[in-house]
Amino acid sequence: MVEWIEIQYPIEYGEAYKMMKSRLTGILNGTASEAVFILEHQDVYTAGISAKNDELLNCYDIPVHHTDRGGKFTYHGPGQIIIYPVINLAVNGRVKDIRNYVNNLASLVINSLKFFNITGITVQDTIGVWIDSEFGRKKIASIGVRIHKWITYHGVAINVCPDLKKFKGIIPCGDRDTIVTSISELLDQKIDLDYYKAILKQEFYKIF
């Protein structure tokens, strides 16, 4: 059974990273169960292994963490719900395929958005979840993962109601044309974060 670990306060990125890695080590050693961390971060820009220095435009006194996930720069902060699955793709009928895993994370987000009558899509040659609006295509969720001995860590960040202005300090995912959005912006209303977390938990088990 996958253990859900919900952090009730915006957590510093480095602290959450240590928790992920500790759980990964425990799974490898047979001393810990699989887990999904569900949380919000304190303001932070994270740089994946493909990030370039010129993609950080202005950090606005926001900390920058270089990390070992795939991808480039992104922003995390309050109002953005993140799930970090630390699960073994070699067990429980799962598929040992990184692309399949990333696609499943995207499907999880797309399915969760349906509860708000929002149609999420994936776009060829990109990673993440997007929406098509009257103002063009916008990104609503970012995915960045790493897999060690078929155990996953890092995960997906969904913009529920973050401060979208803070994305202006970076070139999101290395694409200057990327425009970000959130559930709250699309619906023009406040979103209950606990309600959305419950949806993610429910939909997770339909896929994983």
UniProtKB/Swiss-Prot annotation:
Cellular component GO terms held in the UniProt record: cytoplasm
Residues under site feature: Lowers pKa of active site Cys: 139
Catalytic activity: octanoyl-[ACP] + L-lysyl-[protein] = N(6)-octanoyl-L-lysyl-[protein] + holo-[ACP] + H(+)
Key words, A-Z: Acyltransferase, Cytoplasm, Transferase
Domain BPL/LPL catalytic: 30-208
Chief location of this protein within or outside the cell: cytoplasm
InterPro entries from the UniProt entry: aa-tRNA-synth_II/BPL/LPL, BPL_LPL_catalytic, Octanoyltransferase, Octanoyltransferase_CS
UniProt name for this protein: Octanoyltransferase
Protein encoded by which gene: lipB
